[in-house]
Amino acid sequence: ENNSNLWNNELITRFPPEPNGLLHIGHAKALGVSGGIAEKFGGKMHLRMDDTNPEKEDAYFMKMIIEIVEWLGYEYNNHVFHASDYFATMHEVAKKMIENDLAYVDFTPKEKMSEMRGTLTSFGIRSLDSHNPISWHLSEFENMKNGLYLDGYCCLRAKLDMSSSNINMRDPVIYRIKNTPHIRTANEWCIYPTYDFAHPIEDWIEKVS
């Protein structure tokens, strides 16, 4: 793919650990793949801190992750990316999804939501909140952003397929409320994207191969 100019002859991989602990053997394997491919094919690896959960991130672990990556001998072009660099873009993407009826705000309690997702042998049931007008969802998402609700009171879900054989694809949560100051953005945000929502957007922005 690199030789076909699909990526403009610039191969980019990424290593995106969450700075909530020290790197372990699983991280080392992932780093070996991302860093190794970049090195083998003359590309570059992005070191990106997955700081989407303000309750768990720690500056000490960010520092230690960088030191361990350097100690293992992998190049990251002396630049550290952060998921939080893209919070504004992710928020706009989420709003665009709502406008296109691809996401909705849900006030269903967590336990009930899990129950309504169904099982491996039964389809899930979509929340009644999903049937509200798009204008309602945009307004409630704005209320979430403005700190009107407590943690866990509601969330934003992607409108996918409640009959999917993969339960994780049954309208997954893509934004949740966390009224905890962020290590980099302080109190600028009180809603945060989930891992599965954030990473494809980050990869797209950084032009990861």
Give residue ranges: language-model regions:
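Active-site cores that bind ATP or allylic diphosphates and position pyrophosphate for catalysis
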Residues: 99-209
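N-terminal Rossmann-like or analogous alpha/beta NTP/dinucleotide-binding catalytic cores
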Residues: 1-125
